[in-house]
Design a protein with these regions (language model features):
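Short, glycine-/small-residue-rich phosphate/pyrophosphate-handling segment
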Residues: 91, 107-138
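N-terminal beta1-alpha1-beta2 submodule of the flavodoxin-like/Rossmannoid cofactor-binding fold
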Residues: 1-108
Length: 138
């Protein structure tokens, strides 16, 4: 099986990258693993033009297609993301918004292969354990 582990943080050598490396190293014993970092790709924001609803293609020419090719390659996709103000980083959100041409569940044009498994790992760090515990418990 092929596994894609995606660092969804704009910080390429932080805590998220550390988790990506640990997960990737563990999985390499059994699987064909690739790791990518969202910060290595040029991702424009969705313009909300809805052109993709009719054509199944985005009018923007950036690196989103390169990430989708990695998704197509993989049987399992693991997204590892920090929490920024209780949400995902803007870069990851921009990517998700731009996935509409490939995986809009209401669109007959959706082209992402079915049968893939997806997992997510969310990180929360803070200046103290007390702060992290408060977020985890709520």
């Amino acid at each position: 099986m092929k596994v894609l582990v995606m660092n969804c943080s704009p910080v390429r050598n932080g805590a998220t990258a550390e988790i990506v490396n640990i997960v990737s190293d563990c999985l390499k014993e059994k699987y064909d693993v690739r790791s990518i970092c969202i910060d290595d790709f040029d991702i424009s924001f969705c313009k909300g033009c809805r052109n993709c609803h009719n054509t199944a293609k985005c009018i923007q020419d950036d690196d989103v297609v390169k990430i989708i090719q990695q998704y197509e390659w993989a049987d399992i996709i693991i997204s590892v993301s920090p929490s920024y103000w209780a949400d995902i980083p803007g870069q990851f959100k921009a990517f998700i918004d731009r996935c509409t041409p490939w995986c809009n569940t209401h669109d007959p044009h959706a082209t992402i292969s079915s049968g893939k498994k997806g997992y997510s790992i969310a990180l929360r760090t803070g200046p103290s354990m007390r702060e992290c515990s408060r977020v985890i418990e709520s």
